[in-house]
Amino acid sequence: MFIIKTFNMLNASSKFAICGLPLRVDSYKTCAFGCEYCFANNRKIMEFGKSLQIGNITSVRKRLERIFHGSGAKDGNLIDNLIASGITWHCGGMSDPFQPCEEKYGISARLMELTKEFGISVLFSTKSDTIYDANPDRELHTFQMSVTCLEPNALEPNVPTPESRYEFYRSLKDAGYRVGIRMQPFIPFVTDERIVELYCDADHFTIEGLKLVPQNREHVQRVLEMTGIPKGAFTQMGLLNLRPEIRYELYKPIVRELEYYAIPYSIADNDMHHLSRSKCCCGDALIAKSSGFDNTAMCYEHGREYTLDDVKQCLGCIGECKANQLFTSNRQEGCVTVRDFYEKRFDRKSSPFSPKFLCEFDHIPTDEWEE
């Protein structure tokens, strides 16, 4: 008898300083959509090359019952304290929650039912055109659809057609659900402002440029050949990112359209968080609560010159939570708690949550005369 393995589906992200939704939940360890540009696939984060594994819902339930009906959140436990604080969960950051295997296993549907029971809000990110038999709650469950192009593209070999995904979007909106659009990755010569025109009643837009995994040379070469982008257009910032001056020019027509339709938006590139118009890069309209101490929130509240003291005032008990387990031993630098990591790395120009990391551009012009 073949037994499907399970895995711990609820985790705290090591990107807690740059992401307002550091509680990450994934239903599956695989992704059938097979997007060529997927960094999770090409960094082997979710073990995509191995057999399908499904999220362990039972372990999530036990944790929630302990936190809300038992002994409470454990002191110093980052996941426990993030949950207890009421932060929205993000489902689908590493693998799609509504890929075809959802029809058989229904892990995402079960997650919806469990979070309804405990009153937990969840943002689901997907490229799918269906949620199968899932029954989301309009108040607790929101959606973020990833849209890179409006024509079928070899970069997304197994993704449903753009037409069917728009019909899915339309059905969610017409049923009263909040839905955002994530233009990620934003690919030169592929992604353009027509996406804004089509999804002009979206609750939020997030823009984030194409990123490549430098250690995976085969992946880099394949994507460069498929997109026609020269390698010189990229600069290394951990991953290979399009140069900020290139992204700045590419985003201008998108931002103009977003301003025209009065759609709130965020720039999710780490060096451009200060250009966002929302406190959370996934969209304030799509969440119940973000952490509030990430750098997008700091830029929104204090401007690009926010200080370490500004961050510390928002940390609360999270600052004393253990976070070293989120990093490999060679990246811990003796730090143990969330507060330790901030104090050690905040002033480094290479640190994505430092104001020194932000690009030189202060805003994106929305009118021709501003240029």
Segment roles from a protein language model:
Residues 75-250, 257:
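Conserved AdoMet/S-adenosylmethionine-binding subsite of the radical SAM
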Residues 45-47, 189, 275:
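Alpha-helix termini
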Residues 2, 195-371:
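Auxiliary Fe-S-binding modules of radical SAM enzymes
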Residues 2-144, 150-153, 171-174, 339, ...:
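Conserved Radical SAM active-site core
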